[in-house]
Amino acid sequence: MAIKTLYTAVGRFERRTNGCNRSCPILLLGGQEYMADMQEMVIWSMLNWRILRWDDIAQEYEKLSTASGYCTERSWEDCTNRLLTRGLLVSGSGETEYDALYDLLGSLSIIPTSGPFFLRLASFVKLTLLAHVPVSAARKLFQKEKRTKYEALVMRLAGQALLSTAEIIKCIDKNISRLPNECALLDSLYGDETTTSDNIASMVKISQSSKPVTLAVANLYLRQQIIFERV
């Protein structure tokens, strides 16, 4: 059976003003700033809030390059591998799509976004003015999405502390919905003799909550309600 591999971006994009008073795009991850050239930024942006296979990255990059007429200096493979080496892209592998998804998300820390209001506003304008989509249809962008039980639990826990997907799974397994302080959190997650930050993802993978939580995290990410960090 062929091993399946999935990829996504971690961190967040910001613009900073340099010493020449010029705006420069940077990527923030784990409290550090990373510079990226145009090709790398295109690939990172392609994978931000998306989960793709290797071949999908190639197809998406080809579409963007053709549409923009941008002349590339390096291959997309070189750019992608450099981003993986720098930790700005991450991958997960497994025998099944779900195994690859869990391997990808299990150790990533989750940060809720404040809600992509301006992104939705820009999309609304684009749909109504440029694509001539009826206002009644475009208005659906602003309708509050209903979250599933597990999506709501993920957001509640992620809003209280910086937790990985695996740590959230263990919290839900232990019926923990409130995190009073860091000491109580660490005791709940790592108070036994076997669990460590290195093995928690493998230890909770077979738990009852593992699959619904992992799928909830993936869906929240694809709906741009969370971003991923690496600590």
Briefly describe each language-model feature range.
Residues 1-13:
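Hydrophobic, helix-prone linear segments
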Residues 34-231:
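Long, charge-rich, low-complexity alpha-helical segments
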Residues 5, 19-21, 214:
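Generic signature of intrinsically disordered, low-complexity, basic-rich segments
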